[in-house]
Amino acid sequence: MMYFLFILLGFVLGSTLFAYWIPRLFFKTDITKVPPDHNPGVANAYMQAGFFAGTLSLLCELFKGAVPVFLADRILDRDSMLFALVMAAPVFGHAFPFFQKERGGKAIAVSFGVMIGLFPEIHPLFCLIFYYILFSLVLTLRPHSFRSVITYGLFTLTV
């Protein structure tokens, strides 16, 4: 029963697209209108609404992935197969939100949040950020999905 509650919490939090709503409510900016990908994500919040909206969106997107996983990790058995669903729920909620008629984002920031909730120690977080920045700015990998797969793969091998 507790697993179900954490899965539901994660999916509902994931379905709340902070990177879409923060720019829209505070800056009257629809971040999905101008960019060609029409993605309601943090990168578009930064580009369309500015630094403050982007940073606030990033923090909220990270927390919505981290909070349910962190809390569940303290209460539930991490070794259970159901714990994988707890971790996946915020990501699926973001990718297929019922609040937005299933028009979600790529779930990159919320995936980072899930990892932060699972590994709250500082080293893994810096490692993940380093890989993502490396493949975003230095050795640019496109598309975003390929960059994310490589980042998460290297993260898994090195942490």
Labelled PLM ranges:
Residues 2-27:
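N-terminal signal-anchor transmembrane alpha helix
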Residues 41, 47-73:
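Multi-pass membrane catalytic core of lipid/isoprenoid biosynthesis enzymes
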Residues 1-9, 67-85, 116-126:
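Helix-coil boundary and interhelical linker segments in multi-pass alpha-helical membrane proteins
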Residues 31-39, 99-112, 143-154:
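Short, non-helical or kinked segments that cap or interrupt transmembrane helices
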Residues 15-21, 103-111, 126:
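Transmembrane helix boundary and interhelical junction motifs in multipass membrane proteins
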Residues 49, 72-75, 89, 93, ...:
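Interfacial segments of multi-pass membrane proteins
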